[in-house]
C-alpha cells in the first residue's frame, strides 16, 4: 500500500496537479470570502467563516473529481492496470494507496485556509469573537467530506477508462449524496419519513458537525460512506481479475 501511495502522490507533485489543486481551492475560497460582495466576510458586518464551510463543499465537488478521474481510468486506457494487478499487491493495497494519496492532497488544500480563520479571529469585535468550536467542527466535517468525495471519485474512475466520463459521474454522485436527499426530503409528500430521508444525506451530518458538536453518529456516517464506496471500488477492481 505504501508503494502505491508514494507513487500516486509523487505523480501529483511531478505533474503539478497538487499545486494547481491547492492554488485553485485557496484562490476560489479567498475570492468568495474577501472579494465577492455577496459572500465577503467584510460585507457581513461580523466575523464569520460561514462562506468557507457553506461554499467550500461545492468547490471540492468539482475539484476532487478532477484529482481522482485519472487514478484508474488512465491506467485502464493505457493498459497498465493489468500490470498493476499482477504485482504482489492486494486489491486493498491499490485502493487504499490511491485513496489516501488523494485524501492527503485534499487535506493539504484545506489546511492553509486556517490563515483565513486567523484573519477572521483578528477582525472580531472584540478580537477573538468567533465560534471557535463551530469552526473546528466544520474543519473536521470538511476534511471528512473530502474523504467521501475522494472515495466517490475513486469509484467513478474504476468503472470507466475515460477520464472525462469519470469526472462527470463523480461530480453527479457527489452532488446527489451531498444535497440530493435533503432536496428530496423537502418535498412535502413523505410525512414522518422526511426526517429519516434527510439523515441519509451528507449535508445533514456535515451541518451537525458545523455546530461544534462532534457526535459519533455523524463520524460513523462519514466513515460508513467511505467504506461503502471503497468496497464498491474493490468489487469493480476484483472483477478484472477473472
Language-model regions: role of each:
Residues 65-85, 99:
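Transmembrane helix boundary and interhelical loop/hinge segments in multi-pass membrane proteins
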Residues 39-50, 166-236:
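Terminal transmembrane helical anchor/hairpin motif
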Residues 1-63, 115, 217-242:
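Hydrophobic alpha-helical transmembrane segments
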Residues 16, 22-24, 101-110, 169-184:
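Hydrophobic alpha-helical membrane-insertion segments
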Residues 30-34, 46-59, 101-161:
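Secretory targeting signals
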Residues 91-92, 163:
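Alpha-helix N-cap/start motif
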Residues 66, 70, 114, 118, ...:
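Transmembrane alpha-helix boundary and packing residues in multipass membrane permease domains
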